[in-house]
Amino acid sequence: MTSLVYFSSASENTHRFVQKLGVPATRIPLHDRAGTFEVDEPYVLILPTYGGGITATGRDTSYVPKQVIRFLNNTHNRSLIRGVIAAGNTNFGESYCYAGNVISQKCRVPYLYRFELMGTAEDVVAVLDGLEQFMESEQWHRQSQTQPRLGV
């Protein structure tokens, strides 16, 4: 099975979804202010979407948790991302799972799937099947590209 890296806030919704997958996964620490957490193999990132909104500078990065931004601003970590899966809440309308769009565009990787809150049994099956197919694809084996920093 593919390598998964995920972030889950204190609500643990994303963590519970990853547990349901039943595959090894590495969690981005909730408190890693130094930004020293690194991975050593290609991975698919699973992350929740935060509320979002336009910042004073006009940049819209608040959908992505700050811990994930720090993790991906590490050039080594960013070079190993191969795809993204996002969690969200449909109550947020157009912002539903928007963190996946941001990461996909900024890191130039496919947006593989989105699910609500902790996901359903159908989401688990879809993600496991999709990851298996993705691992066999050319995109999984691609060389890293030069990618811009996410910004804060």
UniProtKB/Swiss-Prot annotation:
GO biological process: protein modification process
Pfam families per the UniProt record, alphabetical: Flavodoxin_NdrI (PF07972)
Superkingdom assignment: Bacteria
UniProt cross-references to InterPro entries, sorted A to Z: Flavoprotein-like_sf, RNR_Ib_NrdI_bac, RNR_NrdI
One function term, GO molecular function aspect: FMN binding
Record function comment: Probably involved in ribonucleotide reductase function.
NCBIfam families, alphabetized: nrdI
Protein family according to the UniProt entry: Belongs to the NrdI family.
Listed name of the protein: Protein NrdI
Organism: Rhodococcus opacus (strain B4)
